[in-house]
């Protein structure tokens, strides 16, 4: 055996590491070339994931465990996490996704000693076996066709050959980027986002009635009935909330693609709720 001093949550411990003749034995608890228990490394990773700086983590580890780490030693450990993230973000993907959902989650983050707003684009895909998969996360500051095209091109480079339906908020420049990357894909604007945008400047006393008229549109049995419901919505509200009517009319094609599908799958297509559920889970840990 070979003696080795290992840092653990109980302090420094002397461990006798078994050896074999070929030198192939690699302990699981304390891997080769490591002088820290996996438990402590996981603690450091968790603190780093919560946004603590390497200096703050170093202070925390000393105060709680009585073990002194330099900031550079902490960085060596956290860099492993960055490598894992990079591998995940660049992993190969399926060749076909019947549906992908795109939505953003926004954070206030510390950058250069000041707090700035950042957005993270989340892309989730529905696989052929019915399971959902997070395809990737991308940080951005401004919405543009160039950024969306870069994301979609990255998906193609990772193996995605075709997408049937893309469901998203009405993000600026996204429709054009989808047509460039996946010409045959159908773009479906999230109905929930569209309703929220329609209600932005609606007075409280009008909300219930206006929502009922909107419901007649997206719960229509088909496109023709939905068009008739839109005409009714326009006759009722155009004079008071013309911006809402105009938004539905100008985006009509990309708002109603879901009506071409059976009722059983429409709700899967016309909302990005699957991403909002994922985003709410992210907020619990960030």
Q: Which residues does each predicted region cover?
A:
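A polyampholytic, Gly/Pro-enriched intrinsically disordered region
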Residues: 96, 205-222
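Short, amphipathic alpha-helical "recognition" segments used to contact nucleic acids or chromatin
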Residues: 39-51
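DNA-recognition alpha helix
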Residues: 55-66
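Acidic/histidine-rich catalytic cores and adjacent linkers
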Residues: 219-286
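Alpha-helix N-cap/N′ positions at the starts of helices
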Residues: 35-40, 209
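Conserved beta-strand -> loop -> alpha-helix junction used to position metal-binding or nucleic-acid-contacting
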Residues: 165-171, 177-213
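RNase H-like nuclease fold core
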Residues: 1, 12, 16-21, 28-34, ...
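Short acidic-hydrophobic surface loop/beta-edge motif
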Residues: 2-8
């Amino acid at each position: 055996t070979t003696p080795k001093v290992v840092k653990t949550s109980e302090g420094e411990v002397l461990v006798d590491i078994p050896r074999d003749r070929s030198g192939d034995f690699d302990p699981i608890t304390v891997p080769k070339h490591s002088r820290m228990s996996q438990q402590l490394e996981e603690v450091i990773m968790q603190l780093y994931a919560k946004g603590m700086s390497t200096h703050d983590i170093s202070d925390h580890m000393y105060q709680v465990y009585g073990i002194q780490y330099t900031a550079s030693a902490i960085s060596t450990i956290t860099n492993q996490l960055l490598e894992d993230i990079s591998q995940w973000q660049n992993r190969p993907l399926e060749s076909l996704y019947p549906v992908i959902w795109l939505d953003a989650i926004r954070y206030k983050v510390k950058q250069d000693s000041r707090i700035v707003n950042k957005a993270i684009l989340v892309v989730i895909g529905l696989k052929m076996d019915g399971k959902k998969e997070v395809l990737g996360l991308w940080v951005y500051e401004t919405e543009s066709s160039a950024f969306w095209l870069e994301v979609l091109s990255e998906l193609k480079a990772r193996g995605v050959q075709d997408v049937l339906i893309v469901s998203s908020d009405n993000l600026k420049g996204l429709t054009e980027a989808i047509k460039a990357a996946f010409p045959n894909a159908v773009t479906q604007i999230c109905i929930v986002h569209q309703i929220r945008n329609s209600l932005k400047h609606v007075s409280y006393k009008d909300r219930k009635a206006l929502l009922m008229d909107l419901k007649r549109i997206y719960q229509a049995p088909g496109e023709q009935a939905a068009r008739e419901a839109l005409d009714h919505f326009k006759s009722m509200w155009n004079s008071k909330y013309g911006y809402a009517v105009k938004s539905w009319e100008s985006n009509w094609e990309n708002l109603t693609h879901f009506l071409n599908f059976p009722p059983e799958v429409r709700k899967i297509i016309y909302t990005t709720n699957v991403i909002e559920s994922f985003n709410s889970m992210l907020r619990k840990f960030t």
